[in-house]
């Protein structure tokens, strides 16, 4: 399931992030790549252990965990500390086809997660750069994603994906992973669809409608059946 979420960060938040990031030191992005990914990864990152990256990452987690659509789509158990990257046209930056590591560990906190969902939060407007599309492959084909600054996309970490070469400007984003309470992507997708339908019924019929209450019970019982906590 590929899900886009609008306005995770406001435009003012994005401007503040960019001001802080532009004044920070960057390093070779291959420092956080696995052995396979490192061969095709060409970009820059904020040092993951830096105070800047941690503070900005905490702001992103706070914004996401108060976003109902994110909670409904991800059903998160653990969120890996967000990382930050930059693809510059002047350096020919891109990221070839790869799949994310199954397990990620954080050196500072000791957190280890199974990567169920990958997240990219865009921090540059689409008209600021050419190229830089996130291309995600699944059983239905390839999907190009290039969202407004402040929006994010969630997709299964099992997906092959790439970032096309940036030919003008710079693509700036945050990226990270999460472990969901619902391991299986198909099960998580069905629960999300059910939740979306229930919310639509609540808007039309109210929370006290008997059939809506029954469906809400089914929703919680499915989570109870599938959840790993």
Swiss-Prot record:
It is an enzyme of class 1 (oxidoreductase). InterPro entries: Oxoglu/Fe-dep_dioxygenase_dom (IPR005123), PKHD_C (IPR041097), PKHD_hydroxylase (IPR023550), Pro_4_hyd_alph (IPR006620), Pro_4_hyd_alph_FE2OG_OXY (IPR044862). Fe cation binds at residues 98, 100, 161. The keyword Manganese does not apply. SUPFAM superfamilies: Clavaminate synthase-like (SSF51197). The keyword ATP-binding does not apply. 2-oxoglutarate binds at residue 171. SMART domains: P4Hc. One of its GO terms (molecular function) is 2-oxoglutarate-dependent dioxygenase activity. Keywords: Dioxygenase, Iron, Metal-binding, Oxidoreductase, Vitamin C. Its cofactor is Fe(2+); L-ascorbate. One of its GO terms (biological process) is intracellular iron ion homeostasis. This is PKHD-type hydroxylase blr3905. It comes from Bradyrhizobium diazoefficiens (strain JCM 10833 / BCRC 13528 / IAM 13628 / NBRC 14792 / USDA 110).
